[in-house]
C-alpha cells in the first residue's frame, strides 16, 4: 500500500531541510546542495516558494520543487525549478503532487504561464509534465556561466 504524501511550503530553513537537500540534490544534479545559509536566502525570497513532499508514515522529506514567480515587463511569469523525488519514493505520485501544487500556486499568484526545463534523459518526468499540460517550446535554452572574471573586484 502506498503511504500518503503531504505537500507543504517551507516556512523556514532548518537543519532538517538542509539534510533533505543534501540527500536529494545529488539525485538531480552534479551541483552542490545549498547549505543552511543559502537555504535561508532561498526560503526568505518573496519570489520563491520551496515545496516539500513529506512521507506521512516516516515524516521524512521525500521530494522538493522550487517555484519562482515574478513580474517581468510582459507578464507575471513562473518557473518550476529543481524538481527532485528521492529514488526510494519514485512511482508514488510525489512528483505529480509537487508539480500540481506548484501550478496551483502559480495560478493563484497571477502567472500567465509556467516554464520548466527537463533533461531528455528524465523520461518519466517528461511524460509527467506533458500529461499535466506542459508543451515543448520551439526555443533555444542558453546558459552563460558566470566566472570570477565577470564579477567586480571586491
Where are these regions (language model features)?
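Conserved GNAT acetyl-CoA-binding A-motif
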Residues: 99, 106-118
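Acetyl-CoA-dependent GNAT
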Residues: 3-76, 81, 86, 99-101, ...
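Conserved acetyl-CoA-binding loop-helix of GNAT-fold acetyltransferases
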Residues: 85, 91-104, 127-132
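Actinobacteria-biased recognition of intrinsically disordered, low-complexity terminal regions
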Residues: 1-2, 153-154
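Short helix-loop capping/hinge motifs at secondary-structure junctions, enriched
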Residues: 148-151
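Residues at or immediately flanking beta-strands
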Residues: 6, 113-115, 141
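Conserved active-site alpha-helix within GNAT-family acetyltransferase domains
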Residues: 96, 120-146
